[in-house]
Curated annotation (Swiss-Prot):
It comes from Chlamydia trachomatis serovar L2 (strain ATCC VR-902B / DSM 19102 / 434/Bu). Its cofactor is Mn(2+). Keywords: Aminopeptidase, Cytoplasm, Hydrolase, Manganese, Metal-binding, Protease. It catalyses: Release of an N-terminal amino acid, Xaa-|-Yaa-, in which Xaa is preferably Leu, but may be other amino acids including Pro although not Arg or Lys, and Yaa may be Pro. Amino acid amides and methyl esters are also readily hydrolyzed, but rates on arylamides are exceedingly low; Release of an N-terminal amino acid, preferentially leucine, but not glutamic or aspartic acids. It is found in: Cytoplasm. GO terms for molecular function: manganese ion binding; metalloaminopeptidase activity. InterPro entries: Leucine_aapep/pepB, Macro_dom-like, Peptidase_M17_C, Peptidase_M17_leu_NH2_pept, Peptidase_M17_N. GO terms for cellular component: cytoplasm. The active site is at 275, 349. This is Probable cytosol aminopeptidase. Mn(2+) 1 binds at residues 268, 345, 347. The gene is pepA. CDD domains: Peptidase_M17 (cd00433). Its EC number is 3.4.11.1, 3.4.11.10. PANTHER family: CYTOSOL AMINOPEPTIDASE, LEUCINE AMINOPEPTIDASE-RELATED.
Length: 499
């Protein structure tokens, strides 16, 4: 995918369907953010009476015989002193939606004068590119006649030296290939995206990139490894479980290793603790953690980062059936820790627990980061725009938070309240898989933390239940799967681990 280009000269630009012109807002009025020809000023001067330049505001106009582009979009960037990476990202995402609805395929974007801003040309370009790429996406549909919006096919940013712009654009395009993979997997029917399909995608990545190796464990191998928690969740499903291990060696001589774990429940009925219909209808997205890990590995291998990363995906359906695991029963995990089942709808933490145990036994991790659509309690706490995360290591937490703020993928650190751990007490097992009806996201994280046992490994748990999937478009994300987490984690690993 090559979509974005840069060009220093305004006069030498190619003809395009549309032109995007940037504006600041000053004293509640629009102020030009770049110098343009008088021919264009004549087109938009009357429109400025109803256009203030506030962030994300757009005005769609038609050109004339004197303009090279016949469609013109005025784009508000807000007050220059308040512009941030996130506002740039969301503004150009909004512009992309407007352009696609107008059926534009080729677009010229005039780069604003930003010498007075607090961040660099590179940062502005990165967020501009991310905004365009994020909304230049269609989720899979099954209509007889395709009703999807046409894609932008070529976007040229003018006023930027190609050597600078094109390097940033190629990187963002590689990154968004991973984001799109994550979105497509989450958006596709659960009948298609089974555990075996996730394994096939992992194999496909390993076939595409020589730096990746893959290992797939089937049910027999899962039982041989004594992953009794994953095996329990898989008991009721007609589809076979898989335990997927991806390995990326970007720095073979280094002992530093990051393990990424993604919850891969390809459909969650709740098991015998059956979900109500309204809560179940979106449960094809319960494998978003697994999809996030696969998207990260796609980008990681494409960008060739000099780090070592292992990805682990425990994958199964949580189905109902005569063989399904039952509430009140006790199952034993890989390391011998036993769990009393208080709810079969708290299955994600069970399969993640066996994945954590596997990572500690075989991968010698420096840090473990897991991704899971784990708790509705997190959605209640932070909504759909912010993912909560837990960490047992302040450096890891600080670095993730910084990467989050620099990519616009919002994370908020949540507390691991030690005294809440007692809510997991069981009289007949080492623990229950649910606590009380309070602090649900915290007790879920405390459950996972127990499986670190005495290992001092740095660990973070990202509960992406609210951010992975939106039932309406929310900038800078499209409707449905967002791909949240791919950009943040790649940026984290590049900035803090690629040394």
């Amino acid at each position: 995918m090559v979509l974005l280009y840069s060009q220093a000269s305004w006069d030498q630009r190619s003809k395009a369907d549309a032109l995007v012109l940037p504006f600041w807002m000053k004293n509640s009025k629009a102020q030009e953010a770049a110098v343009v020809d008088e021919d264009y000023k004549l087109v938009y001067q009357n429109a400025l009476s109803n256009f203030s330049g506030k962030k994300g505001e757009t005005a769609f106009l038609f050109g004339n015989d004197h303009t090279k582009e016949q469609k013109i979009v005025l784009l508000g960037l807000g007050k220059s002193e308040e512009v941030s990476g996130t506002t740039v990202l969301e503004a150009y995402a909004q512009a992309t939606t407007v352009l696609r609805k107008a059926k534009c395929k080729t677009v010229n974007i005039l780069f604003p004068t930003i010498s007075q801003l607090r961040f660099s040309v590179e940062e502005f370009l990165t967020n501009l590119a991310a905004g365009v790429l994020s909304l230049n996406y269609n989720y899979p549909t099954y209509h007889k006649v395709d009703t999807s919006l046409p894609f932008l096919e070529k976007v040229t940013v003018m006023g930027i030296v190609s050597k600078v712009g094109d390097k940033i654009f190629r990187k963002e395009e590689s990154l968004f290939e991973g984001v799109y993979l994550t979105r497509d997997l989450v958006n596709t029917n659960a009948d298609e995206v089974t555990p075996e399909k996730l394994a096939a995608v992992a194999k496909g990545l390993a076939g595409e990139f020589a730096s990746l190796d893959v290992k797939i464990l089937d049910r027999k191998a899962i039982l041989k490894e004594k992953m009794g928690l994953l095996a329990a969740v898989a008991k009721g499903a007609a589809v076979e479980p898989r335990f997927i291990v991806l390995d990326y060696q970007g720095k073979p001589k280094s002992k530093d290793r990051t393990v990424l774990i993604g919850k891969g429940v390809t459909f969650d009925s709740g098991g015998l603790d059956l979900k109500p219909g309204k809560a179940m209808i979106t449960m094809k997205e319960d494998m978003a953690g697994a999809a996030t890990v696969l998207g990260i590995f796609s980008a990681l291998a494409s960008l060739e980062l000099p780090i070592n990363v292992t990805g682990i995906i425990p994958a199964t359906e949580n189905a109902i059936g005569s063989a399904a695991y039952k509430m009140g029963d006790v199952y034993v995990g890989m390391t011998g820790l036993s769990v009393e089942i208080g709810s079969t709808d708290a299955e994600g933490r069970l399969i993640l627990a066996d994945a954590i145990s596997y990572a500690l036994k075989y991968c010698n991790p420096t840090r473990i980061i897991d991704f899971a659509t784990l708790t509705g309690a997190m959605v209640v706490s932070l909504g759909e725009s912010v993912a909560g995360f837990f960490a047992n290591n302040d450096v890891l937490a600080r670095d993730l938070a910084e990467a989050s703020s620099e990519t616009g993928e919002a994370l908020w650190r949540m507390p691991l309240v030690e005294k809440y751990d007692q809510a997991l007490h069981s009289d007949i097992a080492d623990m229950k898989n649910i606590g009380s009806n309070r602090a649900g996201s915290i007790t879920a994280a405390l459950f996972l933390q127990r499986f670190l046992e005495d290992n001092p490994v740095a660990w973070a748990h990202l509960d992406i239940a609210g951010t992975a999937y939106h039932e309406k478009e929310e900038l800078p994300y499209p409707k449905y799967a967002t791909g949240f987490g791919v950009r943040c984690l790649i940026h984290y690993m590049e900035k803090f681990l690629s040394k």
